[in-house]
Structure formats: C-alpha cells, structure tokens
C-alpha cells in the first residue's frame, strides 16, 4: 500500500509494517487482556497497522486465555483449517489484499473454512515465529497467531523475533500486573525495538491515540 502511494505521483507519507506482538503474562488480568485485544483487533476489522498480529501467552494461563477468547466469540482453527487459512494470508509471499479489512467469516469463506457468521477473530495456534510461518506476518485483518511461551523469557524472545520479521520501530504490547512485575516491564521495554510500548491497553487505540 505504501509503495503504491509513493508511486502514485501525488505527495504521500507512509510508515513501515507493524507486526505487533502482544504478550499475556501469568500475572495479567485475563479478562482485561482478552477484551482489550478483541476490541483492538476488531476495530476497522484489524486494518490499523498497530493492531495485534500475534498473541504470546505464558503456559500457566494459556488454557484460561484460550477459553476466554472462545467465550467472547473468537474461533480457534483446527490444524486442517489453520493450513487452509495459511494459504489465504499470503499470495506469492505478499499479503493477500483480499483479506485486508474483511470480516473473520469472509476470510474463513475465502479459505474454505466454515465459521459462525458473527465470529470476531480467527485464531491459529502456531509454533514458528519465522517468516516461513504465514501467521507470523502482518495480516491487517481479524486474524491472529497465538503462541504458547514456557516462561517470560521465551515470550520476550518470540516477541523480539516477530518484531524483527515485521521491521523495527513500530509497536509492542504486554499485559501483566504493572505494580508487582516492574522488573518484567522494564526488561520488556528495553528489549523491544519499537517506538511504542503499550501496557494493558488495546494496541490499535494505543497506537492512534
């Protein structure tokens, strides 16, 4: 999109890709974290470049977070469905323009997957943070990657790689008890090479103010 604007012959200002990771620590308010991410990711159907592209969840609270997402109307893709959506996210190595800003149910239909019409977000549970994993890319739609982290250091490492994949300087997000976990927060903000570090807040709204 930015390249197209720059080549249009008219003045344009553009920014880089986001690929925002959101970490959910085991001290986080899970209801707040999940509701915030849904609020952010469904705003404008995920077109805001600061919106969460991946959720990294500590193992201790992974199942609770997954249940909360499901209870809120998000759809967890099974392995076969995940593979189908993978093939729809990218076309020839680039983001598929047909999914940008579309509803979750529309993207599912494009992928040959059937979901309830009111589905808020499609969530693929994946492991790789490498660019070979389509879910590890910026998706600009109500599609999320969800990763399990064995501990906070593993979560930080995964987030760092996702940021590097998308390009440094954009946005990172974390949910935790900011009073008792100050050391984790300090390390997070020092390790994430992003201009915005958001704490316990929806990243779309945090990014655009």
List the model feature ranges, each with a label.
Residues 2-5, 204-206:
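Short, hydrophobic/aliphatic alpha-helical segments
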Residues 3-130:
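ALDH superfamily catalytic-core signature
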Residues 113-209:
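Conserved C-terminal structural/oligomerization subdomain of aldehyde/semialdehyde dehydrogenase
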């Amino acid at each position: 999109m930015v390249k197209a604007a720059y080549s249009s012959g008219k003045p344009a200002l553009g920014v880089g890709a986001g690929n925002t990771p959101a970490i959910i620590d085991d001290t986080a308010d899970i209801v707040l974290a999940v509701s915030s991410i849904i609020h952010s990711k469904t705003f404008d159907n995920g077109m805001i470049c600061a919106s969460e592209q991946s959720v990294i969840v500590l193992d201790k609270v992974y199942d609770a977070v997954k249940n909360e997402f499901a209870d809120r109307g998000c759809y967890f893709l099974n392995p076969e469905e995940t593979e189908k959506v993978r093939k729809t996210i990218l076309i020839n190595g680039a983001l598929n323009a047909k999914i940008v800003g579309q509803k979750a149910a529309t993207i599912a239909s494009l992928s040959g997957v059937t979901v309830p019409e009111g589905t808020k977000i499609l969530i693929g549970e994946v492991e790789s943070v490498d660019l070979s994993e389509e879910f590890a890319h910026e998706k600009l739609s109500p599609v999320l990657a969800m990763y399990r982290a064995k501990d906070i250091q593993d979560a930080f490492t995964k987030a760092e790689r996702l940021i590097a994949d998308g390009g440094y300087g954009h946005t990172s997000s974390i949910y935790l008890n900011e009073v008792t976990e100050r050391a984790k927060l300090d390390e997070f903000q020092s390790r994430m090479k992003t201009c915005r570090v958001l704490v316990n807040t929806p990243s779309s709204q945090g990014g655009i103010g």
